[in-house]
């Protein structure tokens, strides 16, 4: 034996010791190796502001399980880790900290702020990386990247410049999503929607001479000062005579035209819609079609500007109250209705987002989306589960241009340089900062804005491998293999990686997207600070161990679906760890320092053939499950095989032989135990890396590390289907006899004769398994026969797959006393049935009791009736 196992398993000691060894030995490191197939996963980079939560724990457990599986299958595996600069989140955090010190970022300036931000990143940015190590993540930490490191910045700048030169990046004054709190633009994907109870205000717009009027319904009366038209459907006969005429904006007094546009739904409200091009994306498009003026009335911080007079200086909500009151006085407010609608909020601060026009940088997405759609349609990129194709297509088919500029300082600064000569006005977009304007020679200054975080994250699969340089890693590992991610960032991240991969590299970024859901609490609620139901993975690891947490996450998760997490599942996983550990100690104690040879196939008995056949079958099934990303199914199969078939059955079958006198049989049993335990540890390793390494290293002939050991393969050498089926039949008999003994209160130490009535063709199996029947069923003798002749009167029986098993009771228990006891139980159960039936038959109880109480009473009645039937059957058996 290479090492002796202590009496109890100390996960803290094992995990810290093994992880340090793994990293020191370079087991996680990957190199371009033409002799092996590459397999690469890029880690979804967690924000540097974050700390490990259950979502990270699930995401990285799944990735690590896949990587460890592929590594054991001979692939050159690269799991490339890194962190995201998280532009808005990080800047908000640093600004908040500075505010506590009484410092405003604008007072210290950009350079000083960025210096502070980099210091903050150095101090806190590695926290989550340390926590990922605690999970057992086998990342190649030598290749760890950061979305704002020098290499990523070069890639981001080059992509921006190249797309700009192709006309796919442009600057324009367009409608965007604006967060007045974060003070920055947001992309469509960064806006979340919440249903809010509000109102629908019906407002009358009068003709200049009051000769006609038109009524519009709006959810945002505060935007009325920015109205530039009223739109009606061209097919709406009610307004045919009014198209081309004008009305007056209430309170403001400005004349605006009535235009015809198919965007308007005749059936909604009055069929007339006020058009505010600067504050609604649909209105903006109507404004473009009809060449309407643009009047922006909101400031960046959510107040009314001078064009919003007479409400200048008010917040949007203050303006809403004021203009509604003014329209009531003027008679323009027709009615107010209660109305629930979706309101956009910032995905970071959750404050209301304002649609408004602003001069920003955009990516033209429709031309880029075509190839990104094709590669999924044609199966080059597969989503697992496949239903997420629909989610992806819904986004891509309706994609709009992406606003990529952010009014922040922390991030990749836009590589655009503006000539300061007002007569020139040239904009130079270039990789290298120009010293002067290339057109007129005047001074230039760089754009103040930074790029959307997801712009740089979209290049993660190739920027991390060295692009734009042609590195050996890029050549070998790109396209990467599998992306593991939550369904909540398919729009944010997955779609954009496919867009950038197909455009920049001319190749897909990965061939499979394995999608998982979110981790919810035991009640199915999303974990949140407000609910106080968050669970700290590090606390779970401290109490139960990383393996227990990992196993509970893998077995509780199915692809694409949310999962419920509870400590009970972790406790069950810890119990499994203890079961595996104790079984391994048993094997180790019985092997000692012996040299263990190969299995002698000529000396296998029926139990040996059964366990080797089952090991072989499980290895094949688990391999198929892993290849199909059915990780939860694979983990559960390994669990069930180890717990039930190996520990509960084969080890118990092996014990008499280990202590027997046949030396060659003892040696063969030991060889089988070592083989089955070793292969079981390999099958379990992707999910529980620490305990499997520890136990594997306790076995003779163990390789340097289990993570580089060969994955168990299905082999014809261990195909014993016939013997395995026969052994399963014998085990069914043993289970039935155990159940009979328990039902009849036969003391465990009392041995009994067993009569087995079975067809003649089954007799050899019972002869081969006679020793196991006698030990595991508590039998003193096993009589196998084809009929019921000679079976003692009063014997109890159980029907099994291979026939019928009988055990006589007369010498095992005092039958008269047992009859007396059973009769007492029957009377008690009859009383319980009568009580429950009386209660449920009482109209007063049924009318007044809560449904839950009634259902509980019905359940009690069902249980009592079932127990009564069993007791009466037992009494009949006892009475013969």
Where are these regions (language model features)?
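Protease-associated
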Residues: 210, 214-216, 221-275, 279-285
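Secondary-structure transition/capping motifs at alpha-helix termini
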Residues: 68-76, 97-110, 130, 134-139, ...
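Short, solvent-exposed turn/loop segments enriched in Gly/Ser/Thr/Pro and often Arg
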Residues: 34-36, 44-45, 78-91, 144-152, ...
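Conserved phosphate/anionic-ligand binding catalytic regions in large, soluble enzymes, centered on
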Residues: 51, 214-232, 348, 354, ...
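N-terminal catalytic cores of NTP/NDP-binding nucleotidyl/phosphoryl-transfer enzymes
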Residues: 33-94, 147, 156, 216-219, ...
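Residue patterns forming the tRNA-binding/recognition surfaces of aminoacyl-tRNA synthetases
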Residues: 3, 8, 17, 21-25, ...
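Non-catalytic terminal extensions that flank enzyme cores
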Residues: 1-54, 77, 334, 347, ...
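Feature 926 captures the class I aminoacyl-tRNA synthetase adenylation module centered on the KMSKS loop
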Residues: 202, 394-455, 459, 503-546, ...
């Amino acid at each position: 034996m290479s090492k002796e196992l202590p009496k109890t398993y100390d996960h803290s000691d094992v995990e810290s010791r093994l992880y340090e060894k793994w990293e020191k030995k370079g087991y996680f490191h990957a190199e371009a190796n033409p002799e092996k197939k590459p397999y690469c996963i890029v880690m979804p980079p967690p924000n540097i502001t974050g700390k490990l939560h259950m979502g990270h724990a699930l995401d990285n457990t799944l990735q690590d399980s896949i990587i460890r599986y592929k590594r054991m299958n001979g692939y050159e595996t690269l799991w490339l880790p890194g962190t995201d600069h998280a532009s808005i989140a990080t800047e908000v955090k640093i600004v908040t900290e500075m505010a506590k010190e009484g410092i405003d970022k604008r007072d210290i300036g950009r350079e000083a702020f960025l210096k502070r931000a980099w210091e903050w990143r150095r101090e806190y940015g590695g926290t989550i990386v340390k926590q990922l190590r605690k999970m057992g993540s086998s990342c190649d930490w030598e290749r760890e990247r950061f979305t704002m490191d020098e290499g990523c910045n070069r890639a981001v700048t080059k992509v921006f410049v190249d797309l700009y030169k192709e006309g796919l990046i442009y600057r324009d004054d367009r409608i965007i999503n604006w967060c007045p709190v974060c003070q920055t633009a947001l992309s469509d994907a960064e806006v979340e929607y919440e249903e809010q109870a509000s109102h629908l205000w019906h407002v009358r717009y009068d003709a200049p001479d009051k000769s006609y009027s038109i009524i519009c319904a709006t959810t945002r009366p505060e935007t009325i000062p920015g109205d530039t038209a009223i739109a009606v459907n061209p097919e709406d006969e009610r307004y045919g005579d009014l198209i081309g005429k004008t009305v007056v904006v209430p309170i403001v007094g400005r004349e605006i035209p009535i235009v015809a546009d198919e965007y308007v739904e005749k059936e909604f409200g009055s069929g007339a819609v006020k058009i505010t091009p600067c504050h609604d994306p649909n209105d903006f498009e109507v404004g473009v079609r009809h060449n309407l003026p643009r009047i922006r009335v909101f400031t960046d911080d959510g107040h009314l500007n001078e064009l919003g007079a007479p409400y200048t200086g008010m917040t949007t909500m203050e303006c809403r109250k004021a203009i509604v009151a003014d329209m009531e006085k003027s008679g323009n407010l027709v009615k107010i209705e209660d109305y629930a609608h979706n309101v956009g909020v910032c995905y970071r601060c959750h404050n209301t987002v304002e649609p408004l026009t602003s001069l920003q940088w955009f990516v033209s997405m429709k031309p880029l989306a075509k190839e990104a759609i094709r590669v999924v349609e044609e199966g080059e990129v597969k989503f697992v589960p496949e239903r997420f194709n629909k989610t992806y297509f819904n986004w891509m088919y309706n994609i709009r241009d992406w606003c990529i500029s952010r009014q922040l300082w922390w991030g990749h600064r836009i590589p655009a340089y503006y000539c300061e000569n007002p007569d020139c006005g040239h904009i130079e977009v270039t990789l290298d900062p120009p010293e002067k304007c290339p057109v007129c020679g005047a001074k230039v200054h760089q754009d103040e804005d930074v790029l959307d975080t997801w712009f740089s994250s979209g290049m993660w699969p190739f920027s991390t491998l060295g692009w734009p340089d042609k590195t050996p890693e890029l050549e070998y590992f790109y396209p990467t293999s599998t992306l593991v991610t939550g369904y909540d960032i398919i729009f944010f991240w997955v779609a954009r990686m496919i867009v950038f991969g197909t455009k920049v590299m001319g190749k897909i970024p990965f061939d499979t997207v394995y999608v998982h859901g979110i981790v919810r609490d035991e009640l199915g609620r999303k974990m949140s600070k407000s609910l106080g139901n968050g669970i700290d993975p590090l606390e779970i690891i401290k109490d139960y161990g990383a393996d227990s947490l990992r196993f509970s996450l893998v077995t509780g998760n199915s692809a694409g679906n949310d999962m419920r997490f509870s400590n009970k599942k972790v406790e069950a996983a810890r119990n499994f760890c203890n079961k595996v550990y104790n079984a391994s100690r048993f094997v180790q104690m019985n092997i000692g320092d012996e040299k263990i040879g190969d299995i002698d196939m000529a000396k296998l008995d029926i139990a040996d053939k059964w366990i080797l056949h089952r090991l072989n079958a499980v290895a094949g099934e688990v391999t198929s499950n892993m290849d199909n990303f059915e990780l939860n199914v694979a983990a559960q199969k390994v669990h069930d095989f180890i717990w039930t078939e190996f520990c509960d059955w084969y080890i118990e079958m092996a014990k008499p032989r280990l202590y027997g006198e046949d030396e060659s049989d003892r040696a063969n049993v030991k060889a089988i135990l070592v083989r089955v335990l070793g292969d079981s540890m390999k099958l379990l390793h992707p999910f529980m890396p620490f305990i499997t390494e520890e136990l594997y290293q306790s076995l003779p002939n163990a390789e340097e590390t289990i993570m580089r050991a060969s994955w168990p393969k299905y082999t014809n050498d261990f195909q014993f289907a016939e013997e395995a089926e026969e052994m399963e039949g014998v085990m069914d008999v043993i289970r039935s006899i155990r159940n009979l003994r328990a039902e009849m209160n036969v003391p465990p130490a009392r041995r009994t004769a067993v009569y087995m009535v079975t067809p003649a063709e089954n007799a050899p199996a019972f002869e081969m398994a006679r020793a196991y029947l006698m030990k595991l069923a508590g039998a003193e003798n096993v009589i196998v026969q084809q009929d019921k002749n000679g079976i003692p009167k009063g014997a109890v029986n159980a029907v099994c797959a291979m026939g019928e098993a009988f055990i006589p009771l007369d010498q095992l228990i005092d039958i008269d006393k047992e009859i007396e006891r059973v009769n007492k139980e029957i009377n008690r159960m009859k009383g319980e049935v009568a009580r429950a039936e009386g209660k449920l038959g009482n109209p007063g109880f049924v009318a007044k009791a809560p449904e839950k109480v009634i259902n509980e009473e019905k359940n009690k009645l069902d249980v009592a009736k079932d127990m009564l039937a069993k007791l009466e059957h037992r009494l009949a058996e006892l009475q013969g």
